[in-house]
């Protein structure tokens, strides 16, 4: 269970957030040509987003908002506000990517206000605002509103399948049923997490956790985050064996799938999964997840800290007991631990801003114990040809 020294860093994205209103006044320097349509501007902004040109996408979204707002005012009563609603929602997502949180919240709120006058409101602004809310009660309200919209969409799809109301629900909506179920499941998971944390002292907290996760599992039994969150609930109830069972069930869903699969959880969720495995003394699966996270981004100091701690704990658990042929000895585990902790210290030395004092103190304590035991840091894992891989070797192969 070694590692390679080959590393790559992924571009950061806002993936951790889910997929009478007057539009906020856009910049007057971003006037749209008269022949351009709102839809065309939004298509162009989507192309800029795909190219990670968020500044360019924001300018196009501003133009779309301005044009849609002007058209809405010109048409007066009976005008369709959906284009403006969609433009505001897309603008908010772009602003999230740029870190403009206050502006994003304003535009999501404006989109929601417009959506109240449409027959097909979008759940996305509510899901975003649930993550950005200032209070747990506000967050819970947004999750609940998003869930209501998603449940209405699912009900419309069911009626369409049965032909009850003459074809409610388009073919595209029918094909998107899995995505709708996943979004509803994630809303319920979000509500559960609120009752596990900020609202944990509410008298109905435990009951709501059980209720929401049961609903989520019924909506989308293939969502690994349902079982991961259930593991957290079981841990809070001191039911460790049940927690292990739930966590392994969730992990097995995505363990062997490709990273571009819709089932594959986002990075923060996988990091939480690793932490839960560590809390349950399940060191080997924790290290498997952490090693993947290292390979995705070798500049995440928290991952190096957790990897070092996991290897240390695994070495302690192995001790001097007889081991299987393919198992690392205590000394080998601790050698890996020292490599990880040295990487942590290098990153913290390079950029100490935001450093966690407790984490740093723990790392120094572990390093002192490893030094006292005469442990030398591992060199990494051997490549297939028996040599050591490094970043320059991989770069040369890709050229």
Q: Which ranges hold each PLM region?
A:
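Alpha-helical segment of the N-proximal tetratricopeptide repeat
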Residues: 36-70, 97, 189-201
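Amphipathic alpha-helical repeat scaffolds of TPR domains
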Residues: 36-43, 81-93, 119-137, 178-199, ...
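Structural motif corresponding to the intra-repeat A-B loop/turn of tetratricopeptide repeats
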Residues: 51, 98, 133-136, 198, ...
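Residue register within tetratricopeptide repeats
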Residues: 55, 102, 137-140, 203, ...
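Amphipathic alpha-helical segments of tetratricopeptide repeats
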Residues: 65-68, 72-73, 112-113, 147-155, ...
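Short coil turns that delineate tetratricopeptide repeat
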Residues: 69, 82, 116-120, 151, ...
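Solenoidal tandem-repeat scaffolds enriched in leucines and small polar residues
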Residues: 138-253
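Structured C-terminal portions of repeat-based eukaryotic scaffold domains
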Residues: 241-377, 397
């Amino acid at each position: 269970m070694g590692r390679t020294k080959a590393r790559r860093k992924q571009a950061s994205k806002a993936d951790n957030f889910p997929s009478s209103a007057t539009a906020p006044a856009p910049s007057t320097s971003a006037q749209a040509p008269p022949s351009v349509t709102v839809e065309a501007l939004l298509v162009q902004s989507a192309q800029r987003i795909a190219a990670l040109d968020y500044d360019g996408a924001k300018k196009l979204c501003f133009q779309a908002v301005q044009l849609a707002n002007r058209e809405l005012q010109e048409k007066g009563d009976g005008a369709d506000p959906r284009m403006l609603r969609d433009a505001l929602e897309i603008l908010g997502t772009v602003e999230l990517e740029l870190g403009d949180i206050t502006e994003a919240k304003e535009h999501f709120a404006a989109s929601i206000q417009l959506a109240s006058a449409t027959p097909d409101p979008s759940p996305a602004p509510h899901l975003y605002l649930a993550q950005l809310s200032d209070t747990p009660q506000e967050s819970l309200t947004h999750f609940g509103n998003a869930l209501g919209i998603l449940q209405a969409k699912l009900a419309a799809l069911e009626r369409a399948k049965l032909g009850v109301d003459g074809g409610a629900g388009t073919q595209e909506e029918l094909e998107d049923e899995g995505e709708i179920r996943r979004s509803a499941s994630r809303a319920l998971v979000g509500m559960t997490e609120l009752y596990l944390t900020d609202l944990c002292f509410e008298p109905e907290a435990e009951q709501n956790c059980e209720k929401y996760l049961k609903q989520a599992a019924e909506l989308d039994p293939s969502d690994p985050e349902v079982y991961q969150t259930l593991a957290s609930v079981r841990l809070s109830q001191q039911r460790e064996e049940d927690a292990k069972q739930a966590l392994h069930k969730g992990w097995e869903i995505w363990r062997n799938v490709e990273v571009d699969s819709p089932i594959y959880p986002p990075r923060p969720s996988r990091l939480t999964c690793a932490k839960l495995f560590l809390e349950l003394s399940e060191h080997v699966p924790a290290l498997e997840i952490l090693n993947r996270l290292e390979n995705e981004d070798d500049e995440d100091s928290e991952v190096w800290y957790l990897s070092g701690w996991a290897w240390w704990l695994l070495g302690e658990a192995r001790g001097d007991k007889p081991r299987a042929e393919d198992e690392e000895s205590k000394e080998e585990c601790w050698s890996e631990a020292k490599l990880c902790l040295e990487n942590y210290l290098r990153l913290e030395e390079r950029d100490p801003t935001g450093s966690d004092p407790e984490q740093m103190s723990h790392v120094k304590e572990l390093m002192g114990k490893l030094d006292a035991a005469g442990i030398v840091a591992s060199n990494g894992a051997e490549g297939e040809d028996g040599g050591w891989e490094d970043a320059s070797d991989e770069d040369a192969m890709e050229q």
